[in-house]
């Protein structure tokens, strides 16, 4: 059995640790921070808002929040990070000053009205391009009043932006979503003294009576990153893999559960539970069968491109529905997946809210064809999850990806670990 500590710290927790430190009054410590481009954007923005950041060890920082958030003299650059833009919008909506949030071309084409509308319900002064649909966003911090909001979409980023505004509003605010989304924001903030009550999926958020407590967080490995290597094991005959020190929050392992339903052998062993459950995941190859994914989409939407690779190896027709949000990620991920599969000659089709893929079960004829004829270049669309998903497919087919460097957005170690997997041995350090 191959043992792997992927050393890819959780992206969601890394973002939140930095952003939440700005609502504390004393120095906070973040250990095992994800040094991916997205999370570094959040860290740089914190510095531009007045936080002092000091290296304490490898991938670890002491963050001293400012006495009051500073009005920056320049645009706050979120680069490719939707989490940075959406969560900072919630945080800054009640802070004194003028703030402009912008990003790269991809981020500035992603939907922002989904956060602008709930923030305006508080009375926030926030504007976006093209009738509030897109960034850049301009925020003039102002006093907020509590509100009730029912979100039409299940999104941890929308929920988190709302919660960060609610903590700074006058009165108790209520948030309801149509499907459970990731709950790291609630867990972390409650541990730091925020009063957030969850009753049957409805959040009631009281304003902060005092600054958040200072914290010392050590961040576990990201299950979304670990999933790529669970997928690699599932499609590689005779493979057995132990993924170590992985965050096992129930809202984050839905993709592993889907792979398990497809036939892969997957077992969780909890090693600790402090703030969040952390443990090991055992994965073993087995023949895969088709799956229909139509529920709990918010809990696995980031992993659907990777799951599409598993679907290629499954017996039967697999289906994804109710996943329209895939079209407004870093790329149109429905189009990206299906256009690449069609270029490879795979039977598949896209819908408005998903796709189907007819599994090959036996991929050897396709491999033989590409050994005789050069296969088409796989297009990443500069989307890290598309690039990494199809990079896993290179374990079985002789394919090339047009831009695997974009994996650095969330998983800087990916290329090195993939090469080690191909060799059959790991040293995750």
From Swiss-Prot:
Keywords assigned by UniProt, alphabetized: Amino-acid biosynthesis, Aromatic amino acid biosynthesis, Cytoplasm, Transferase
E.C. numbers: 2.5.1.19
Entry keyword Amino-acid biosynthesis: yes
Pfam families tied to this protein: EPSP_synthase
GO biological process, one term: chorismate biosynthetic process
Binding of 3-phosphoshikimate, residues: 11-12, 16, 155, 157, 302, 329
Domain of life: Bacteria
Pathway: Metabolic intermediate biosynthesis; chorismate biosynthesis; chorismate from D-erythrose 4-phosphate and phosphoenolpyruvate: step 6/7
UniProt cross-references to InterPro entries, sorted A to Z: Enolpyruvate_Tfrase_dom, Enolpyruvate_Tfrase_sf, EPSP_synthase, EPSP_synthase_CS, RNA3'P_cycl/enolpyr_Trfase_a/b
SUPFAM superfamilies: EPT/RTPC-like
Any one GO CC term of the record: cytoplasm
Gene3D superfamilies membership: Enolpyruvate transferase domain
Catalytic activity: 3-phosphoshikimate + phosphoenolpyruvate = 5-O-(1-carboxyvinyl)-3-phosphoshikimate + phosphate
Active site residues of this protein: 302
Binding-site list for phosphoenolpyruvate: 11, 82, 110, 157, 333, 385
GO molecular function terms attached to this record: 3-phosphoshikimate 1-carboxyvinyltransferase activity
Cell location: Cytoplasm
HAMAP family: EPSP_synth
Function as written in the Swiss-Prot or TrEMBL entry: Catalyzes the transfer of the enolpyruvyl moiety of phosphoenolpyruvate (PEP) to the 5-hydroxyl of shikimate-3-phosphate (S3P) to produce enolpyruvyl shikimate-3-phosphate and inorganic phosphate.
UniProt similarity note: Belongs to the EPSP synthase family.
Subunit structure: Monomer.
The protein's name in its UniProt record: 3-phosphoshikimate 1-carboxyvinyltransferase
């Amino acid at each position: 059995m191959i043992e792997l500590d992927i050393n890819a710290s959780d992206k969601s927790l890394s973002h939140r640790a930095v952003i939440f430190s700005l609502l504390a009054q004393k120095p906070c410590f973040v250990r095992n921070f994800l040094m991916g481009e997205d999370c570094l954007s959040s860290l740089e923005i914190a510095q531009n808002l007045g936080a002092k950041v000091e290296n304490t060890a490898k991938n670890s920082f002491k963050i001293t929040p400012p006495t009051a958030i500073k009005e920056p003299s320049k645009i706050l650059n979120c680069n490719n990070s939707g989490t940075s833009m959406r969560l900072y919008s919630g945080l800054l909506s009640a802070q004194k000053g003028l703030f402009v949030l912008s990003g790269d071309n991809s981020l500035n084409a992603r939907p922002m009205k989904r956060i602008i509308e709930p923030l305006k319900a508080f009375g926030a002064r926030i504007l976006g391009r093209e009738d509030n649909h897109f960034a850049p966003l301009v925020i003039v911090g102002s006093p907020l009043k509590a509100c009730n909001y029912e979100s039409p979409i299940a999104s941890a980023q929308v929920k988190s932006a709302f919660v960060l505004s609610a903590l700074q509003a006058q009165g108790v605010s209520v948030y309801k979503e149509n499907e459970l989304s990731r709950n790291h924001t609630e867990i972390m903030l409650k541990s730091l003294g925020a009063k957030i009550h969850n009753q049957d999926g409805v959040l009631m958020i009281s304003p902060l009576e005092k600054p958040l407590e200072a914290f010392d967080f050590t961040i576990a490995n990201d299950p979304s990153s670990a999933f790529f290597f669970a997928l690699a094991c599932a499609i590689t005959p005779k493979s057995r893999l132990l993924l170590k020190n992985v965050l096992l929050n129930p809202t984050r392992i839905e993709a592993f559960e889907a792979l398990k339903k497809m036939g892969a052998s997957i077992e969780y062993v909890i090693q600790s539970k402090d703030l969040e459950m952390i443990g090991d995941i055992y994965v073993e190859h087995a023949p895969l069968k088709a799956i229909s994914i139509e529920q709990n989409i918010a809990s696995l939407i980031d992993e659907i491109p990777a799951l599409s690779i598993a679907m290629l190896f499954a017996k039967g027709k697999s289906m994804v529905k109710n996943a329209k949000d895939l079209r407004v990620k870093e790329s149109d991920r429905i189009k990206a997946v299906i256009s690449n599969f069609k270029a490879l000659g795979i039977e598949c089709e896209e819908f408005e809210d998903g796709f189907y893929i007819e599994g090959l079960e036996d991929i050897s004829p396709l491999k033989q064809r590409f050994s005789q004829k050069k296969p088409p270049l796989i297009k990443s669309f500069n989307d890290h999850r598309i690039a990494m998903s199809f990079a896993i497919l290179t374990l079985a087919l002789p394919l090339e990806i047009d831009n695997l460097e974009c994996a650095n957005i969330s998983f800087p170690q990916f290329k090195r670990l993939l090469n080690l997997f191909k060799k059959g041995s790991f040293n995750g350090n």
